[in-house]
């Protein structure tokens, strides 16, 4: 016997939208901070790790989504700034 999927309430949709918006703001601010340059490579990596932790806190069990959506942006930026290959 299969159960029908439940439809999320407006409050649940609003809450998820707030969490998405918060994560997007943090990611954009983190990218901007790293892009300013002048910080050690390790500090840039710590910023990425902090953004990843926030994503996992906001969306438990969805760390793979961060890796698909945001990690490539961080990698491109860090590679360009620190001339990594």
Region spans (language model):
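Helix-rich interaction surfaces within compact, conserved domain-sized segments
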Residues: 50, 54-85
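N-terminal acidic leader/helix
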Residues: 5-41
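Mature extracytoplasmic or otherwise solvent-exposed domains
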Residues: 22-23, 32, 49, 79-81
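Short, solvent-exposed positions on alpha-helices
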Residues: 42-46
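Interaction-prone helical segments in low-complexity regions
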Residues: 1-3
